[in-house]
Amino acid sequence: MGRLQRTLSNISEESDTDNGRVAVVGGSIEYPNQPALVGRAALRTGTDHVRTLVPEALYAPVAGSSPNLLVSPYDGDQFDQDAAADAVDICEWADALVIGPGLVDAEADAIRDVLERTDIPVVVDALAIEPALESDLSRAVLTPSGSEDGPIYEAYGSLRAFTEETGAVITLTGGVDVIVTTGERLENDTGTSALTVAGTGDTLAGITASLLGQEMDRQDAAELGAWILGKSGELATAEYGPGVVATDVIECIPKTIR
């Protein structure tokens, strides 16, 4: 782990894109805040620019949540083929993509279309996981929470079979986090019970995407991402006690990295 931590100190100053650009596709009326949490976590992990693509109705609240986020709206409330085209355009700008946080009622074909038409590393999260199982996942890290891994077990029987057949990497958080990749199973034991609070899954997605956008390979990004989330949760718990929320964890990410 020390080897991975040291890579975070190698921040170049050659240009304004050296630390990567992350695109975030997510959000809905039911879950409006997820894209902002993902974006803030990515920025705190070192990403230079984050652009979120959200339904038109969410543009104002997401844009107003942080002046550090770039926000693009798509027409309507449902992520459909037209919105997918917007996402593909943004991915031309980005170094890594997160798709799925809060993405309620998205068209499955639209999610698959984005994955098939982009060639950057991608974090597939939450409601994008099930439709993504029919896509090429050789560039993907999956970050399911709770029962979101159910479709994986249903389709493949085990995480090992899933990763070996698809080439994907998967991070499962819990009392001990598990990172599964082709031929390997890793564990991370950082963290506290505070990380069961809402929004920490979005935080993990943002951290992982930031590392991917900084050109870390998928297994290392998944492993270090889980470690950063856990350590940040420990710092937040020490500072705030039992009332920790996801934004507290996000604000502790720079301390963890230092």
UniProtKB/Swiss-Prot annotation:
Domain YjeF C-terminal: where?
1-258
- Cofactor(s) the record lists: Mg(2+)
What InterPro entries does the annotation carry? CARKD, Ribokinase-like
Alphabetized, the UniProt keywords read: ATP-binding, Lyase, NAD, NADP, Nucleotide-binding
Q: EC number(s)?
A: 4.2.1.136
Q: Has the keyword NAD been applied to this entry?
A: yes
A GO molecular function assigned to this protein is: ATP binding
Q: Where does (6S)-NADPHX bind?
A: 202
Q: Which GO terms describe its biological process?
A: metabolite repair; nicotinamide nucleotide metabolic process
PROSITE patterns recorded = YJEF_C_3
Membrane-spanning intervals of the chain? none
Specify which residues bind AMP according to the UniProt entry for this protein.
Answer: 201
Reactions catalysed according to its record: (6S)-NADHX + ADP = AMP + phosphate + NADH + H(+); (6S)-NADPHX + ADP = AMP + phosphate + NADPH + H(+)
The protein's assembly and partners: Homotetramer.
Which family does the record assign? Belongs to the NnrD/CARKD family.
Stated role: Catalyzes the dehydration of the S-form of NAD(P)HX at the expense of ADP, which is converted to AMP. Together with NAD(P)HX epimerase, which catalyzes the epimerization of the S- and R-forms, the enzyme allows the repair of both epimers of NAD(P)HX, a damaged form of NAD(P)H that is a result of enzymatic or heat-dependent hydration.
Q: What is this protein called?
A: ADP-dependent (S)-NAD(P)H-hydrate dehydratase
Query: What is the native source organism of this protein?
Result: Natrialba magadii (strain ATCC 43099 / DSM 3394 / CCM 3739 / CIP 104546 / IAM 13178 / JCM 8861 / NBRC 102185 / NCIMB 2190 / MS3) (Natronobacterium magadii)
